[in-house]
């Protein structure tokens, strides 16, 4: 059995934007929210192989990350996209995730958490 965690989709210490908009020093390429949300961990697998996937996982390698505030920004809101990949599987809907993430943004604000604004820009 396996937990799916491919580097090109699940390493959240990678940049969130291609232009690296004030994201500080990190490592690797970029993995935007939309790419995480669109991931189908079962794509191209037989039913038999699917049965061996017990979950998905994102990773945060911290050797280039200076503090917890930066970790929050690197995780949020992509962590919400990863949760949808696991929970909703093939029931995901772009219009639904936008609404859910607006609700989550209010929650992040109420908790005083830091998050990357890139997904939300122009959607208020």
Where are these regions (language model features)?
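Substrate-binding groove of N-acetylhexosamine-processing glycoside hydrolases
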Residues: 1-124
């Amino acid at each position: 059995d396996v937990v799916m965690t491919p580097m090109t989709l699940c390493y959240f210490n990678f940049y969130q934007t291609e232009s690296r908009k004030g994201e500080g020093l990190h490592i690797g390429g970029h993995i935007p929210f939309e790419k995480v949300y669109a991931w189908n961990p079962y794509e191209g697998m037989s039913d038999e192989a699917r049965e061996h996937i017990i979950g998905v996982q994102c990773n945060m390698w911290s050797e280039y990350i200076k503090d917890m505030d930066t970790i929050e920004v690197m995780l949020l809101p992509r962590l919400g996209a990863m949760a949808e990949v696991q929970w909703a599987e093939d029931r995901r809907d772009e219009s639904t995730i936008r609404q859910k993430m607006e609700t989550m943004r209010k929650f992040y604000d109420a908790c005083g958490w830091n998050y990357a604004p890139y997904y939300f820009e122009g959607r208020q």
